[in-house]
């Protein structure tokens, strides 16, 4: 892996020099814009001020690209991890900070639970891992997220590649209003695979992996919305794993399901960890204990404690962790 990282860094040197050059230009342009705004009238020049502020926002987004050696390729990245997060902060609406100085590792082929009260930052954090939050306007961040040794915010890995490698299953059941088959085949074609036999096999394998094939193999052209809740969630999982991601993110995947469907999904998640690293947001302490290997406790946008699930629930090191898992807070 060390040789691969060195090769990646060498190939990226020229690109970095270009980034540094353009970053200086962007920063200079922002200074000029800010000087111009100070000379404008808020009432009579409102449209021009708005235009300039939009330009500044665009330039600030471009400046997000990092320009130093250490935060593009992490040479000391631990091969036991898939993610290493360092000094990460995140804001909505530019000034509403919701994540504070996050430092943690997510281990390969483990099921890691993110726990904590509603609004503590769990769902925001999990969406940072494949940059879904970047699809929203007026967000910003500082710090570094390394995926398999590469900084996802450096430009070395594009967003489409990242989201293919880091799949997502949402809390709300989200099957497309297509057939069962097309729910999976649609994304396969979008990634440039058009051979009919290849698509058929990928769909079949995804449904098998999601423990759904035997239930739907004779009705693949049935509308996905006619499936039960548990079947719909397994279809969403099949869709997420069809292109063989490294990581599967799950944001409360069983919160909308009954106990029988929940048991089915939990069993599936445990089976999937043989192939994928899984990160799951959950409010269920019982579920965390049943199926996860690692647990990270969030409170008020901060990581309070990280450890094995057994350690967190039997010998928590922090009083806040103990209060939460015991139901006192």
Curated annotation (Swiss-Prot):
UniProt-recorded name of the protein: Phosphate import ATP-binding protein PstB
Subunit and interaction comment: The complex is composed of two ATP-binding proteins (PstB), two transmembrane proteins (PstC and PstA) and a solute-binding protein (PstS).
KW Cell membrane (keyword) present: yes
GO biological-process terms attached to the record: phosphate ion transmembrane transport
Similarity comment: family membership: Belongs to the ABC transporter superfamily. Phosphate importer (TC 3.A.1.7) family.
Keyword Chaperone: no
Signal peptide interval: none
């Amino acid at each position: 892996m060390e040789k691969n990282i060195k090769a990646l860094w060498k190939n990226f040197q020229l690109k970095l020099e270009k980034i540094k050059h353009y970053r200086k230009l962007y920063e200079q342009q922002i200074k000029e814009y800010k000087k111009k705004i100070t000379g404008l009238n808020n009432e009579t020049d409102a449209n021009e001020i708005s235009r300039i502020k939009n330009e500044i926002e665009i330039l600030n987004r471009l400046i997000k690209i990092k320009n130093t050696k250490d935060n593009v390729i992490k040479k000391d990245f631990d091969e036991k991890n898939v993610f290493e997060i360092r000094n990460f902060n995140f804001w909505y609406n530019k000034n509403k900070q919701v994540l504070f100085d996050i430092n943690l590792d997510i281990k390969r082929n483990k099921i890691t639970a993110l726990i904590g009260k509603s609004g503590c930052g769990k769902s925001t954090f999990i969406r940072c891992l494949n940059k879904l939050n970047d699809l929203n306007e007026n967000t910003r961040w500082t710090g570094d997220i390394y995926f398999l040794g590469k900084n996802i915010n450096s430009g070395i890995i594009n967003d489409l590649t990242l989201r293919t490698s880091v799949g997502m299953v949402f809390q709300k059941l989200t099957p497309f209003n297509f057939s069962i088959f097309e729910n999976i085949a649609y994304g396969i074609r979008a990634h440039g695979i058009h051979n009919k036999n290849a698509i058929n096999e990928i769909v079949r394998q995804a449904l098998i992996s999601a423990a759904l094939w035997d239930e739907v193999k004779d009705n693949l052209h049935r509308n996905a919305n006619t499936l039960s809740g548990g079947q719909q969630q397994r279809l969403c999982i099949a869709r997420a794993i069809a292109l063989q991601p490294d990581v599967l993110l799950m944001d409360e995947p069983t919160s909308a399901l009954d106990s029988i469907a929940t048991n089915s999904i939990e069993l599936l998640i445990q089976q999937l960890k043989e192939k994928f690293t899984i990160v799951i947001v959950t409010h269920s302490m019982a579920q965390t204990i049943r199926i996860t290997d690692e647990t990270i406790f969030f409170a008020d946008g901060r990581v309070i404690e990280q450890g094995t699930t057994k350690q967190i629930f039997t010998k928590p090191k922090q009083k806040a962790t103990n209060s939460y898992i015991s139901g006192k807070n």
